[in-house]
Every structure is written in structure tokens, then in C-alpha cells.
């Protein structure tokens, strides 16, 4: 199968940006700046970037409990993303929930899964 260069470049950019966000989030946690917890997905970025590369307008997506930085790929602005993780009012739920409350229904993000194996894919 042959892919267009533009598609491959965007996929690489998405993988790189997600990795950088995961590393930043891990660094902030190591500095004790994250009041809650994180589930680092470092090393798993390509799997989520690849899945998200197939999204079409109107599709819905539920974030995994790892690679929460994939929220950025589906439209979560950085100030909102880091606001929630750092317990700031600019977060998705006003900084009250941390990574468990990342989500943006307006971008088709239903939220995240915090438990392994708790979700089933349901086509709509």
C-alpha cells in the first residue's frame, strides 16, 4: 500500500507532538507539579496517532488511559489540556479531575477510559 507524502508527514508530526507532550507531562509529574496522577504512554504514540489519522468529521473517539496526549490530536487546546492536568481553572472540567476528565464533546472526544478492558467498540 502506498501512502501520500502529506499523509506520512502529518502522521510523523502527530507522533512527534504526542511524544513531546507525553515527555512534558512526565517531567511535570516528576517535578511534583501535577497534583494528581498520570498514566504515561511514552512509546505508544504511533498506535494512537495511526488510529486518529483515519478519523473523519463527525466521528467520535474515547481516549485511552495511556497516551492522554492524544487528546491534543483530536482538538484539545494545549491550555485546556495542561490546565486540567495541572488543576487550573482553564482545564476541561475546571482542573477538578486531572487526566480522568480530559474530553471535548465538540471535537468528538467522549472522555477517557480509566480501566483496562472496560470499553467496547460500538459503531454509530
Go through each PLM region and give its residues:
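Cofactor-binding active-site loop characterized by glycine-rich and histidine/acidic residues
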Residues: 23-26, 31-124
Amino acid at each position: 500500500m502506498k501512502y501520500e507524502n502529506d499523509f506520512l508527514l502529518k502522521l510523523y508530526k502527530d507522533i512527534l507532538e504526542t511524544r513531546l507532550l507525553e515527555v512534558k507531562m512526565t517531567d511535570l509529574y516528576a517535578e511534583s507539579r501535577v497534583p494528581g496522577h498520570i498514566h504515561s504512554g511514552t512509546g505508544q504514540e504511533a498506535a494512537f496517532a495511526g488510529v486518529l489519522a483515519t478519523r473523519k468529521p463527525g466521528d467520535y473517539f474515547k481516549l485511552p488511559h495511556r497516551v492522554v496526549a492524544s487528546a491534543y490530536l483530536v482538538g484539545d487546546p494545549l491550555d485546556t489540556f495542561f490546565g486540567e492536568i495541572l488543576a487550573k481553572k482553564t482545564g476541561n472540567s475546571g482542573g477538578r479531575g486531572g487526566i480522568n476528565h480530559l474530553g471535548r464533546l465538540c471535537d468528538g472526544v467522549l472522555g477517557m477510559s480509566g480501566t483496562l478492558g472496560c470499553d467496547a467498540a460500538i459503531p454509530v
